[in-house]
């Protein structure tokens, strides 16, 4: 099965914005090449996770090997590497592009070029891939292929004279795509005689076989009984099996330069087989690893707490298992006076955070409270030390620190120009600094802003979508840290600090946020037998407060008429009891209150 000359191998991926039809096109390619029998076919075939199907997005990377007989009569082997399209998973995209020589750029013929498409196209151009433009959904009444071709030429600078029109839904133009892959994507370089090097572009955890690694052999060959060495983690393993994805796994004896396959070697955790790492042979190692390996760094942090304290061990176990298959997830234990025991987790972005939370609740049946997302701040201390802080509650007191720096991103928003004003307003509300505005076509515009990441990770994306009726798309990347006048805003409930509600905000916004927080809490916390003060403070200064008035029993109900001193005595006794209650009483804040306030926080 694997004795294919290198000249007949093609490795390619599909680049597309969310909802432009990437997974559907992958389905059609699998069907057209008879890789998957019609009876086994289901929509989004390569998206195995239930969550992926439901949200209609690709989260984990997949690969499939197809055989195709071209018009020249030769049989070619095409390796399709399916990539995620969302900004959070751009590191997954970058490494899968490294395993390819070509890419299909799929653009919705009714919507045009979107932000995510562009971000991934630039990654593909950096990797010197041959890009084939494909206009999808040409069967839709609103499609305008000629206009979109001009857009691709003006924005990306690609020649679209040979762009392929197709409809992944009906199967129109799919054969043209397969033929174009054979004719236009270059074959891998013939490096069979060199020392073995293979690039890991994905891995997942199998409870029975350990970690299954997806890799692309870039030089030399790997056989089923070799001993391998992972160059970044310096760990060696004996192979249990190697094989190809067609798209179900099939064992083979050997894979040589240019081929894509999987291996199992009783590897315990995904973190041992890092994506982007280089595999080589233990007895004849390559001199250098493949370039471009970087570790994915978490950008967004939040606390995860079980609603029921008894579920803490279950949450720990669930996170351990999830981390086996998601090397980008980081976590460490944390405690909070209000929430008990939980974990501080780091994610690549908001979608990643949502997906991890949803998988924990679904696959492990946990009930979770999630604190407001925060980013990593750099705190410069008076003694010259620089601290990196991801939990607002641990920010040092003002008298010990010199300044706080926060991460900034360069944000590009693509939208119809009718929504210019509302988008600029949104960016200014979020402390954005205007950089540039470019007209892509007569009716579409690109806005470029630099803004704090903390303002983006909350609900910026939702706001942008709702203000533009879903037409805008965005892409951002980190550009470094900048000093700002930031303060820690604490919330006190009955004089006790509620850690999960602590946030770091800009001084100009502190009063507005503090006022909104205490007002919201007043609505949500049930009244008690004693008065509860709610306060928002910066350091020792209270900037906003509210009171929840006490429930009061009518102690004078039995005194019809009678002496005033008797009534006074009863009222004083009640006041004394309430005073004692207030000093000893503990306010139970309901879960819904935390959830609602965290939404407001964001």
From Swiss-Prot:
Domain tr-type G: residue ranges: 7-189
SMART domains: EFG_C (SM00838)
Localization annotation: Cell inner membrane
Membrane topology qualifier: Peripheral membrane protein
InterPro entries documented for this protein: EF-4, EFG_III/V, EFG_V-like, EFTu-like_2, G_TR_CS, GUFP, LepA_C_sf, LepA_CTD
Residues annotated as binding GTP: 19-24, 136-139
Domain of life according to the entry: Bacteria
Keywords, in A-Z order: Cell inner membrane, Cell membrane, GTP-binding, Hydrolase, Membrane, Nucleotide-binding, Protein biosynthesis
GO CC, alphabetical: plasma membrane
Reactions it catalyzes: GTP + H2O = GDP + phosphate + H(+)
Job description of the protein: Required for accurate and efficient protein synthesis under certain stress conditions. May act as a fidelity factor of the translation reaction, by catalyzing a one-codon backward translocation of tRNAs on improperly translocated ribosomes. Back-translocation proceeds from a post-translocation (POST) complex to a pre-translocation (PRE) complex, thus giving elongation factor G a second chance to translocate the tRNAs correctly. Binds to ribosomes in a GTP-dependent manner.
Family, per entry: Belongs to the TRAFAC class translation factor GTPase superfamily. Classic translation factor GTPase family. LepA subfamily.
Protein name: Elongation factor 4
Originating species: Prochlorococcus marinus (strain MIT 9211)
